[in-house]
Design a protein with these regions (language model features):
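Solvent-exposed coil/turn segments that connect beta secondary-structure elements
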Residues: 47, 79-82, 111
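Bacterial N-terminal signal peptides
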Residues: 7-15
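N-terminal secretory signal peptides
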Residues: 23-73
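Sec/Tat signal peptide C-region and signal peptidase I cleavage site
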Residues: 17-21
């Protein structure tokens, strides 16, 4: 009988502690940056407007994160259908220019251009080119850059 009573009291106390813990505000406010510098590559390979804008917004959010201010290198690697973001006939020029003005490297895959028969004149004049988008991602990852594919 004592054992049942002790188990019941113990279970009740554990339950009450869990309920009280849930009522207290969370103390976690995100990871604390411990490095002097961070590097990230964002990969874009879709022409979906929502995903393009979401990726550009994610880059902006990373640049605006107070923990990363002045400590972040960013590159946007575009390949495949993602080429839409750099096309002069699409509505992304101001967004992309804004990111470049904040130091974001804007890279376009030359393999995609060749396969899709896209001339550089069809793309913004201020972007850079890499021989292969996948190659760029591989190199950056091996150099320690974080890879983001929203």
């Amino acid at each position: 009988m004592k054992t049942i009573l002790l188990l019941t009291v113990s279970l009740l106390m554990t339950t009450m502690a869990a309920v009280n813990a849930q009522k207290q505000p969370a103390e976690f406010h995100g990871a604390t940056p411990t490095k002097a510098h961070y590097q990230v590559v964002y990969q874009l390979n879709t022409d979906d407007d929502g995903k393009i804008k979401g990726t550009l917004r994610n880059i902006q959010n990373a640049l605006d994160d107070p923990r990363l201010k002045g400590k972040l290198d960013v590159e946007l690697v575009v390949h495949g259908a993602g080429v839409s973001v750099y096309r002069t006939d699409k509505p992304y020029e101001e967004l992309v220019k804004g990111l470049q003005s904040r130091g974001v490297i804007l890279a376009m895959c030359e393999n995609t251009m060749r396969e899709r028969k896209i001339d550089k004149k069809e793309l913004f004049p201020f972007i850079s080119y890499v021989p292969s988008g996948n190659g760029e991602l591989i190199i950056r990852q091996q150099e320690g850059w974080a890879i983001m594919h929203p």
